[in-house]
Amino acid sequence: MEQQKIPQATAKRLPLYYRFIQNLSLSGKQRVSSAELSEAVKVDSATIRRDFSYFGALGKKGYGYNVNYLLSFFRETLDQDDITRVALIGVGNLGTAFLHYNFTKNNNTKIEMAFDVSEEKVGTEIGGIPVYHLDELEERLSSDIQVAILTVPATVAQSVADRLAETNVHGILNFTPARLNVSDNIRIHHIDLAVELQTLVYFLKNYPQ
């Protein structure tokens, strides 16, 4: 299987499939059809079959998909046996919420440390996660932390990203409105909640169901 030939849109849907398949396995279900998957994850059946076709024969016509096989396959494909260690920068309201949540439903993803400049927060633990001063960023980030979550003010987002580029971080989940410029070896996913909300409102007004 050549991962580079899988469309990015398909890759983004894989965790969604995996989560639903996990729930099916926990409920004791042995097999599932593409129609059942479609109803659960709100992706049309043709798209699901096309997504799955990139990985070869995952199911049988007239039978559907074996739940345990899919679970094992996607677990390996998504590297669920490898721990992803994450650093969070910016312990405001959103950052604090992340620390309390800490991906409790994803056993392979864990925020290990956080950074801020607030004297009230530095030196404390939030959700069991230590908060260090931002000045200690390069010193504290260990080589096994390759992902960072940015929840800092937009005005400092680029400078923080520049510093992260000098570490072993290769992925940034950016929750600030700033559009960051980084080297090609760092992948950034931008999540602007205000833009998402505006988009939702636009669709509600212009594409009524």
From Swiss-Prot:
Q: Which UniProt keywords apply?
A: Cytoplasm, DNA-binding, NAD, Repressor, Transcription, Transcription regulation
Q: Where in the cell is it found?
A: Cytoplasm
For this protein, the record's SMART domains field holds:
CoA_binding
Recorded hits in InterPro entries, A to Z, give: CoA-bd, NAD(P)-bd_dom_sf, Rex_DNA-bd_C_dom, Tscrpt_rep_Rex, WH-like_DNA-bd_sf, WH_DNA-bd_sf
Gene Ontology molecular-function annotations: DNA binding; DNA-binding transcription factor activity
Superkingdom of origin: Bacteria
Q: Which cysteines are joined by disulfide bonds?
A: none
The record places the DNA-binding region at 16-55
Q: One cellular component GO annotation, for this chain's record?
A: cytoplasm
Similarity comment: family membership = Belongs to the transcriptional regulatory Rex family.
Q: What is this protein called?
A: Redox-sensing transcriptional repressor Rex
Q: Which gene encodes it?
A: rex
